[in-house]
Amino acid sequence: MGRYALDMEKYADLARTASAEGCVLLKNDNSTLPLKKGDKVAVFGRMAFHYYKSGLGSGGLVNTRYVVGIFDALRACKDIALDEELIGIYEKWIKDHPYDEGEGWGLVPWSQEEMPVTEEMLQTASGDDVALVILGRTAGEDQDNTDKPGSYKLTRTEEDLIRKVSSQFSRTAVILNVGNIIDMKWVREFDPAAVLYAWQGGQEGGNGVCDVLMGRVNPCGKLTDTIAEDISDYPSTSNFGDLQKNYYKEDIYVGYRYFETFAKDKVLYPFGFGLSYTSFSVQASAEEKDEHTVCVKATVKNTGTKPGKEVLEVYAKAPQGVLDTPVRVLCGFAKTKELAAGEEEHITLEIPKNTFASYDDSGVTGHRDCFVLLEGTYTIYVGTDVRTAQKAGSYPQTFTVLEQLEEVCAPQKPFARMTRKLGDVIGYSDTPERIYGPYDRVEKPAEISQTGDKGYRLEDVYDKKISMETFVAQLSDEDLIMLFRGEGMCSPKVTPGTAAAFAGLTPSLRKFRIPAECASDGPSGIRMDCGTKAFSLPNGTLLGCTFNCELVRQLYEMTGLELRLNRVDTLLGPGLNIHRNPLNGRNFEYISEDPFLTGKMGAAQLQGLNIAGSTGTIKHFAANNQETKRHEADSIISVRALREIYLKGFEIAVKEGPARSVMTTYGPVNGVWTAGSYDLNTIVLRKDWGFSGIVMTDWWAKANHEGQPSDPRIHAVMAAAQNDVYMVTADAQDMQQDDMLEEFQKGNLTRGQLQRNAINILQFVLKSPAMLYEMDRISPEELKDRKNAAKDDPDVSKMMKFVADEQGNIRISGGGWDTHQGKEILADLDMKAGSYELQMKVKSNLDDLAQLPVTVYLDNIIKGTLSFRGSKGQWVTQQIRFDTFEGHHYMKLYFGATGLTVDHIAFQLSGGADKEQ
């Protein structure tokens, strides 16, 4: 196997291991788990038959070669026997209650209709040894959860299922195939013997869960979120989901920082909690090593009878003084190797004090906008979850300023934020008045004198024959503006079906041998809407629950190699936003309520991706903590909460990954849309953190001038803020699509700013695989390995291609199409922006009782299902409507039953549409 060959067996093994290590066991009475050899197992729940491998949206649209669900893996296990009669009852019911795929993007059901459990089913399973109840939930991009049955809460049918099965079986295990945590009050009410969070484990998820259920892997996952009694117990809930403004009044008291400080009695399962099939003891000590570091030494011993892994968690408690602090802050963790019964492992962690420093945004310590260590006693706690961690040591600390920074992204007006008063009582105080407006500190770099084309090519910079500045001096003003614009989605200039192309997209830029760079959606795998297969990874929450950075790094090393083989330069992930509230639909894509864990896991993913030369784009920078009205809803946050909570994970990933690419959000923070925030994109990223990569917008992002609404044409403020690449346009050469040229001519956007951004982009290009292809410096070994990869993928070069006429219409003949059940028709469509009506003319010789569905996908997103019936040989036409953006799209027609003859399909443009559709 060559150096660049993708070892799919190793890839699958790593994903399977991660899926297993991310499972979190919350309860295990009566030794219900692991399953015993010879057990007869009753599987309940219709979601056993449809596994959620991922959440919804851009992060979930990976075409996979296979998906192993929990039921699939159980059925393949030879050590147990499934109750086939019960399975038959479910399969018969599901035929009459098929899976509901919803109506497309943002309109997919959070859950599926559950089969009511009957006395017949219970009687059928009465002789079985153990019952597994499998429940599922999904949510995702543009689709938050709601505090309703079928979403955050169980439905009555699901409650009835758990109640009846738990009453009949002393060994009942409920398995949750979910992306986010859900309401868990039912555990106490119905008392199932075991409860396991299995999350969404990608294409190997079922195998990983089965390994845990069978005891091949001892559960060792830990919760990355606090599970509280009720959704109303989370302090963010009262300020979540507003369509205009969300006040982060809980401030730094997010997740366990709030509950351990103010509301211990509201916690059902604490942060960091997770059971094992064995038991462990922890002996630890902590002391100050020097003025910068605390040293923790611990011995973890397996005191049980089964081999297993344990997670060591370290928390700091700062002194309470003029600056209030939470009673616990995670500042270190480590996962043991697999320890045999009686075996122990000695762990030493050297923890920088800046991991638990506090930020003073008001000057109450005398040092405004500084990270500080407070005067007093710092106490270190060590254990296996935040609640049971024991004191390991303490030390006296003198007041110390660790880092002088400056105010960024401050609220326009003060608002009341939560504080901790003496006696751990909740108080409120106003955020400080801001000093700087969003444009007060915008720097205008000196311009490089333009020389025109001197014959230099980007390869000359790569070979160090000339400086980057000499190269950029050749670029015209139009070149610099066009370099700012990415194209997509599904640009034909890069790997088919991917999210975007950027850099060398126009003839004038290509003249300088600037390659087109490729970006693909992630972070759950490579999304290629043309049908090319890729590996579907476990979701972000599951990976966080492993607490195993080395395992995650190894897994993403495989993904990095997969990116390189597919000529993708950056994966749009990992997602590093904070689980501020359990109802955020995109929590599955993010990691935790804790910024330290988030940053460490994000850095591990980047370290793996970077090895093969491609990289990741960390997102969404910053504070993308709800999907409802994410383009408009203003996140109003104190500078302290930004610095300690919502930016900290990004900071760790930028510095330790290191990150080379960052994506901003759709919406505003404190009145300024992040795509055009100089504070975020220049001061925080580049000045404070030393970031030297590129920043890109989210797709079709908007910006604003402070105090004004956002506008999709406002791009110049993005470039001035050092957001280097606007994503995405249909044509980078179109100078009328935005305000770039106009603002440049007015002097509001300078040549020096554009040249600075160009240098950022081109420095990224120089480190990318695309540059090696451009210079023809790819090794024969890599070319061979790439040629041998993925032979079963569709040949995009032979795909039908159609271009809209002047009116925007496309007509495709269906003559000769194979429309047997399960067959697909793929086509590459070059469409205009607007509202389309798709008309499909078919006939069937079957009678009118025949059901002949055809599902229509555009760029892997379902647009609708045409529900034909038998027409006794008569031609019939049905239609669906949808909006789309200008550019290339990949259409797929999926035939759900045999019996149709297609005359043609036609796409008719009927009106303009918003680009965000």
Where does each model-flagged region fall?
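Glycoside hydrolase catalytic-domain context in secreted enzymes
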Residues: 1-388, 409-844, 853-917
